[in-house]
Amino acid sequence: MMGPEDAGACSGRNAELLPVPGPMGQDGKTVPATGGFSGGAVAAEPPGEAGEEEAPPPRQLLQRYLAAAAGPLQPGLGGVEAEAAAVPAARGSGMTNGDSGFLLLQDRRGPEEARRRRTCGRPCLAEPADEGVDGAGGLDDWAAPLEDPLRSCCLAAGDTDDPDPTATTSAGRDVGSAESSLGLPDARFGSRNTFEVSRRQSAGDLLPSAGQSAPLPAAEQGPGGTTVRARRSGGFADFFARNLFPKRTKELKSVVHSAPGWKLFGKVPPRENLQKTSKIIQQEYEARTGRTCKVPPQSSRRKNFEFEPLSTTALILEDRPSNLPAKSVEEALRHRQEYDEMVAEAKKREIKEAHKRKRIMKERFKQEESIASAMVIWINEILPNWEVMRSTRRVRELWWQGLPPSVRGKVWSLAVGNELNITPELYEIFLSRAKERWKSFSESSSDSDMEGLSVADREASLELIKLDISRTFPSLYIFQKGGPYHDVLHSILGAYTCYRPDVGYVQGMSFIAAVLILNLEEADAFIAFANLLNRPCQLAFFRVDHSMMLKYFATFEVFFEENLSKLFLHFKSYNLTPDIYLIDWIFTLYSKSLPLDLACRVWDVFCRDGEEFLFRTGLGILRLYEDILLQMDFIHIAQFLTKLPEDITSEKLFSCIAAIQMQNSTKKWTQVFASVTKDIKEGDKNNSPALKS
């Protein structure tokens, strides 16, 4: 079969186009070449018997050359392969597919002979054509296309690397005679391309072994055992119409898949370096130190909890650097033990934290599911029938569990009501007045201009509101200057100071207005804000009515002694009155002291139960931290209650609030408050410990 080297070798080689000197015969004279690539059919000439005349000089030339390069030449040169198969070609010193391919003349055989020649394993030369057969010429025409490629390739037998001693000896025996007769330089060729090696290795089982000859089909043998080439018309058009490289293409794929890369210029391309993971590094370290660590299966760990600790898995105990003295055996064992203890403690700590996170996530998911189910009930059943269902037991239980955020603002507005009959248009009127006042304050800010203003007007100044707004929920960064709700909060507070100049602005109002803004629209938030501050308890505190404030403190102490008598006596021993911690809680409605989500839940029940729940929540906080407060003195108690811990949860707080009984000898909050008010009017101050001070 012919390859790309074969086509390149014989392309353009024609005795008529390019004159080539004829080969030298035994007598040193130029022998005219015969034949050529004219495409004519060549009839095989039967080999002569012993004693007949010698072969023509060109045939001797080729016979000597091929004997040195690939074994003895077939005597017939017309497709006889028996003698060629008897002598194996020496590997490395024989011709490659690029050398012998151009010696193949046009295939004029039939399909059966073509298949036989493809499985032969050694190229067979066609015999020189007879005179007058398909335009074949004499000896010059036959030898010219063969001699020129041989001279251009400068082929000669090289050293052999075949392990077969017989082939090496037989090939080396004829090297000297071939070189002397041809006069060609010594050129050593191994495998001229990467495909030849694979062809020799992969097609070794197809080659006939030494001493055997490939039998020819009977149909292709002429009389007397000679080989006859079938006549076929056609020239180079038929030659190039065939598929020249089907076998080479298949072998190329096998070479590419079997080898890591092409070996170009004697260099093998480096392999791609794989990045090492932490597990590979740890395995290499354990293999180097001779210690194996049994890693627990990851699947079982993931079944227990979703959070897999990862920080300690990358800790690797390394030896000392080479420039430092090596560790002793005892020291290495001690360090190994300390390392294992450190890793074990870190694992326990991470597992504990992972369990805690998992528990928090479960509680959060459970709460979200309950809120989602409650939202459907509130939207579809309760809100459409608010006046009828607001006092039912089912609604009160849902209310206690917390309102869904999507309906919280609506429920707050309905629960607080609008006794003042404030409309959005009225809010716009008071807002415009507030803007005019701020403008006048900015234009005239001297002390002489401020002397004639009332106390409420002074507290309604722009500077005081700005200062308090900047301290409202500072962790959220939404009410400060430049935040999305800064202007809205500023407008509501300014409009309220114009609406209630008798109350004005008091520190703590900004937190109440901010919580309403987060759940309501601007106008609705102002309406709820004004009605909420109009309640008796809030009005007493924000107007700083000391007599009313003392009544609320006295009523609170009655229930404090009833529910937490031990803590009540502890506070009395330090002379700690409720005003130290209750003022901040009541002024801001716990929105400053508690986390925002927990404060909103307190607001939910406050809208249902009124001012009573504010003081009940205070008792619940004292009950929650009763054990801690009993161990503190006056200063630490005041500091602790002023700034409560941030990790307080709604479940714990509301469980403590539920344990507080707001009854004193069958008297409820309103009844106790009325009795305390009556006692104050009569001048009896002995019933309230707060009033004694």
Swiss-Prot record:
Stretches of Basic and acidic residues bias are at 106-115
Which of the residues bear the PTM N-acetylmethionine?
Answer: M1
SUPFAM superfamilies in the cross-refs: Ypt/Rab-GAP domain of gyp1p
Q: Which residues form the Rab-GAP TBC domain?
A: 402-610
Short name of one Pfam family: RabGAP-TBC
Keyword terms of this UniProt record? Acetylation, Coiled coil, Endosome, Phosphoprotein
Q: Which SMART domains match?
A: TBC
Q: Where does the record say this protein resides?
A: Endosome
Q: Which InterPro entries match?
A: Rab-GAP-TBC_dom, Rab-GAP_TBC_sf, Rab_GAP_TBC_domain
Subunit organization:
Interacts with RAB11A; this interaction recruits TBC1D12 to RAB11A-positive recycling endosomes.
Entry-linked PANTHER family: RAB GTPASE-ACTIVATING PROTEIN 1-LIKE (PTHR47219), TBC1 DOMAIN FAMILY MEMBER 12 ISOFORM X1 (PTHR47219:SF15)
Q: What is this protein called?
A: TBC1 domain family member 12
| UniProt organism field | Rattus norvegicus (Rat)
Gene that codes for this?
Answer: Tbc1d12
